Regions:
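Leu/Val/Ala/Ile-rich N-terminal alpha-helices, chiefly Sec-type signal peptides and the beginnings
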Residues: 1-121
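Surface-exposed beta-strand edges and flanking loops
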Residues: 15-17, 148-152, 202
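Long amphipathic alpha-helical segments with strong coiled-coil/leucine-zipper propensity
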Residues: 95-197
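Conserved small/polar residues in nucleotide/adenosyl-binding loops
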Residues: 201-207
């Protein structure tokens, strides 16, 4: 078994979220006509969830989770698999479980409030509101997905695996340093957020 197969695993994280937007060609043509412009010169999209935060909360958490995943792993192949050192995997998996639970909770909140969000958007969208822009709830919920896969590092067939031991050791050292750097950056960012929260709390208490 190759040394790298003993010291790392492959992980893949795919997160999808309903876009909650729709291109408004009718409005494009109207604006183009009023401005004496070609409709092809613009793209206008309606925010179907304007006025509420539920969908934005899901989007934000999904984006942060993707960045977190990228920050603790290294590229492996074009299929989306990334390399995670076994020394970090337990902590990685623990954090993953928390982030997935948060995603599921946010998505479930969105599911419960979807119709209410649509009514709120109706107030904001005015004359451009169209009931047909909003898919049935079941169809919308199919757009939300969190897929996580763990796989062993193959014995051969990849540059990292087939490298001679000396070159592989150099790659391994470089990877370890990169992972450590990313962890340090993430820790500093968490410290900044914690300090900011403490300052806000202190300010509120003083008021």
């Amino acid at each position: 078994m190759s040394a790298i197969a003993n010291s790392a695993v492959l992980v893949r994280l795919n997160i999808s979220v309903w876009g909650a937007s729709k291109r408004n060609k009718e409005l494009e043509h109207e604006v183009a006509r009023n401005k004496k412009a070609d409709p092809q010169a613009m793209r206008m999209y309606d925010n179907l969830m304007v006025g509420s935060t539920g969908h934005r909360d899901v989007q934000r958490h999904a984006a942060q989770s993707r960045l977190w995943h990228t920050g603790l792993t290294l590229p492996w192949d074009e299929r989306g698999y990334r390399l995670c050192p076994t020394s970090l995997f337990i902590d990685y998996k623990s954090q993953h479980n928390v982030k997935r639970a948060t995603f599921d909770r946010l998505v479930d909140t969105f599911r419960v409030k979807y119709l209410g969000y649509r009514e709120t958007a109706k107030e904001y969208r005015g004359d451009i509101f169209n009931e047909l822009d909003y898919p049935p709830l079941a169809e919308v919920m199919e757009k939300f997905c969190w897929n996580f896969t763990v796989a062993p590092v193959p014995q051969s067939g990849h540059l990292y695996v087939d490298l001679p031991e000396q070159e592989l050791e150099e790659v391994r050292t470089s990877c370890d340093q990169e992972v450590e750097r990313k962890i340090a950056e993430a820790s500093k960012e968490n410290e900044k957020r914690l300090l900011k929260d403490c300052l806000l709390y202190t300010s509120d208490a003083a008021d």
